[in-house]
Amino acid sequence: MFNLIRKSTEWGGKTLILESGKIARQANGAVMVSYAGTTVLATVVTGKTKEPVDFLPLTVQFVAKSYAVGKIPGGFLKREGKPSDRETLISRLIDRSIRPLFPSGFYDEVSIVCNLLSYDTVTPPEVTALIGATAALSISGVSFNGLVAGVRIGYLPSEDKYLLNASADDMLYSSLDLFLSGNEDSVLMVESEASELSESQMLRAVTFGHQNCQEVINLIREFSEEKGVQPIEFIPHDINPIVNYIESSYKQDFSLAYSNTVKKERVLKLEELRDKVLSDFAEKCSVDNVECDNQDVISALKSFERSLVRSQIVETSSRIDGRAFDEIRNIEIEVDVLPKAHGSALFTRGNTQALVVTALGTPQDEQIVDDLDGDRRENFLLHYNFPPYAVGESAALRAPGRREIGHGKLAWRAIRYVLPEKSDFPYTIRVVSEITESDGSSSMATVCGASLALMDTGVPIKSPVAGIAMGLIKEGDKFIILSDILGDEDYLGDMDFKVAGTAEGVTALQMDMKISGISVDVIEKALLQAKDGRMHILSKMNAVIQESRNSIKNHAPRIESIFINKDKIRNVIGSGGKNIRDICEKTGAKIEIIQDGTVMIYAVNNEAVEYAKSMIMDIVTEPEIGKVFEGTVVEIVKFGAFVNFLGGKRGLIHISEIKNEHISAVGSVISVNDKVKVLVIGIDREHVQLSMRRVDQETGEPIDGELYNVRKSSFSDDSSSSGTSSSGSSFKESYSGNRHGSHEKRRSGGSRSSRRNSSGSNYYREDLHSSDFGNNNRSFSNSRNGHEVPRKPRFF
């Protein structure tokens, strides 16, 4: 029933298997690829386009269902929704790798779906998916020029060792994360992030990756030969007569239009000429009474313009806007352009402009990423927006598409390495790039603008980052590398090569080809020329702002962390969250408690942070003999006054310790709610003995001298340590003297915290937020044998 074909090889220490003939047999081509514990089903289906187009309508979709790792999706529907960013990025990797290998003029619809069926969370799924897509194309009968393989490369600088298809654990120690695709002869696509690696280290990684593609390419070739499906020969329409006519009639007009250095004027003139050519051919066909194929005319126009611009660059050694090959456009930079933003920058390079804005948040603002590798929290977000007005188009705003997601991710990779560690800067950072004008290299303008905005914000980045886009004009064996390409040079050229980095090295590299690959020699020259351009841009940036500001803006949120003894966590929380809720209500701050004793305080200003911190420290600080504290009188009794200090702690000022003279009534000196400064002079278990007379009530300083010796016999070291008061009665007896008052009621059973499990282990989760403690959300309500018993949940 099944005509099963199977090929396998050992690659990178793992088994790679290609199978076909059993699953998805209605598709033009279907291949099941297994690499170690990761399995992908790749299918190819083709069809004719419904309307004439002048581009390849290729659609690539990478689909990762949660069942691949044995999970059920979250949410109400328990079903996968729109593609995740990771699915989108992998889809783009595959698309960019195979698109250059379709023949010129091939405009049939091609749909490729790569379904991740099983994932071991170790083997890179993008590698497996690209191999599957290429293998499926090779047996689909679609015209496709060559075979492609992909690899993921890591690098251990301490060992000077490159890693092939390394696991996620191995990549934690890698200074490079590079995905590369190539055919037998050349490199087709590169996507990477690095830790300030040199150009030579990046080039060696590319060479290493391309060499390791060859074994897989040979396997796919053997697999397709055994399948025996021959590709349908594609015969393009002969558009040379149309190209010749356009050249003879419109060459001078197009040359003049392309010489205009103002993009808006250039675009309008080119659109006018294209419309004129189309109407000219429509009229000509009507006169000759022949049928005109609009698609052929559009293709001929594109071919003519491409040849015209490229020949002008090669012959005149001058570019569209008159620059030299390695010349950078004029750069204008401003920072702090938006008064209420936490940081902002306006980066303008020629007719490309990015307004980049930063916003700081608390760790509670981190993005929770639901990923097949496991849920994680991301504290650095970078979003790239490309509105239609940036290129003078009238269109409705839409949700971010694949291009926006891809460009934002590239800028994210370029910036991430220079960010401070979370322990040093615990904020959540969001960077938004609004492209307000575009004439090429908007993603690299985003990188430059993001670096400037972060420094303006006060984020202590390691060093500034700049980015530049390089282009290529290749004619035969000759090639020209262009620095800082325009949009038209990107559209009509052979390569889009983007490099971002600091003065020390490369942090991100992306390469896309429009031809069937380039050699390593071309990549080397592009890297070196890009370095010169990057240094030039960095010098312009440094002239405006060289390093991060010393502090964040006054209107930015404040975050401070303190450490407390883990045994004190339950005291900070209080009964049913009473204490932590009280702190939040009084200060306006948010409190997060982590199991290791770290307390994070988030507030809108420094005053709120300091207030919250002082309240927490009052709770966790233990009174010490000889220390002075400020307290509030809460109760007057005949033998003294009770004072609350250090949060909820209570102590007694005996009547003899109120003033350094005889007083007949306590109420004649102090009253309830008075603020007083007290010295701890005795501690007997939980009872604290305080003194006012030994403290200067104005300065809060202990008073030296004779005052310490008054009634010395009553305050000897022996009596203090045993808890004896100056009146001769014990301190414990002083407390018991108020047996019928509110204090005794509190001692006799009002405090639940005194009866809690001393370990406090049941009192917090891994992370505790102040919002977790509501009046009706107490987790513990019963006590049994001195330990808390969790309340059973109710089910309705």
From Swiss-Prot:
Entry GO terms, CC: cytosol
Region (Disordered) location: 714-796
Residue ranges with Basic residues bias: 740-755
Domain KH: 557-616
Catalyzed chemical reaction(s): RNA(n+1) + phosphate = RNA(n) + a ribonucleoside 5'-diphosphate
Biased composition (Low complexity): 714-736, 771-784
Domain (S1 motif): residue spans on this chain: 626-693
SUPFAM superfamilies: Eukaryotic type KH-domain (KH-domain type I) (SSF54791), Nucleic acid-binding proteins (SSF50249), Polynucleotide phosphorylase/guanosine pentaphosphate synthase (PNPase/GPSI), domain 3 (SSF46915), Ribonuclease PH domain 2-like (SSF55666), Ribosomal protein S5 domain 2-like (SSF54211)
Compartments (UniProt record): Cytoplasm
Function according to Swiss-Prot or TrEMBL: Involved in mRNA degradation. Catalyzes the phosphorolysis of single-stranded polyribonucleotides processively in the 3'- to 5'-direction.
Family: Belongs to the polyribonucleotide nucleotidyltransferase family.
Protein name (record): Polyribonucleotide nucleotidyltransferase
